[in-house]
């Protein structure tokens, strides 16, 4: 039987560890066994048990303290991940060979690991050799995405990971439970965005015509090919977590030997589900 994996990615502070913790608890309530592997050598703490912890292999602090290497925080993390890529046998021994595994890999947040270095690509290829079906889960903080230019930055980061890793990917806006009513109303348009209208709304903020043309070209590429869409993630809402999990399961065909169901919303009614999600919260006191 195949094994399953989520590669949980996103900028620092986007809620990767919280997502892993919440998803483990949610899957536990569904009688599904899910385990977590920490791949962040700079992680300080997390509130869930881990199947494997890269800090047992190598830590950023140890690398930075090595005077022969003379690395700072970013260089130290890159060194750690390259060292990890040369020691996948350590990960293999930690994972074992149990069939039907479902594992969340909590990854570091430095974007250069996905855009400039092949380390994460090597990891994906190795997991696939071990018969894992891998889905990328790219998280962005919804509190960061309430402005059009910041949203475009988040979209490009998600797109970079998608193009680099060449695996199915679900993009998720986290911390929806922390937004106020006004912010929730603003963020709704970014879940299934019309990139052209977003540019029109901010056209008076461009300081350079070249910058405007570049932004328009990027937005056109994203919009024309429907390359990036986001799902809301509210850890206090079971239905919201179910929708996210169903999309990921569908991407990796989890439980394909059973009668598999499509995600709850089709493209036609996706916006209706988002409307219901925000309407429920608008009615809250």
UniProtKB/Swiss-Prot annotation:
Taxonomy, superkingdom: Eukaryota
Disordered: region residues: 261-285
Pfam families from the UniProt entry: ATP_bind_1
Binding site for GTP: 13-18, 174-177
Residue ranges of coiled coil: none
Composition-biased stretches (Acidic residues): 265-277
Segments carrying motif Gly-Pro-Asn (GPN)-loop: 72-74
Record keywords: GTP-binding, Hydrolase, Nucleotide-binding
GO molecular function: GTP binding; hydrolase activity
Keyword presence, Isomerase: no
CDD domains with a match to the protein in the record: GPN3 (cd17872)
Keyword Hydrolase: yes
InterPro entries: Gpn, Gpn3, P-loop_NTPase
Annotated site location: Stabilizes the phosphate intermediate: 74
Gene3D superfamilies the UniProt entry points to: P-loop containing nucleotide triphosphate hydrolases
Function: Small GTPase required for proper localization of RNA polymerase II (RNAPII). May act at an RNAP assembly step prior to nuclear import.
Subunit structure, as described in the record: Heterodimer with gpn1. Binds to RNA polymerase II (RNAPII).
Family: Belongs to the GPN-loop GTPase family.
Name this protein carries in UniProt: GPN-loop GTPase 3
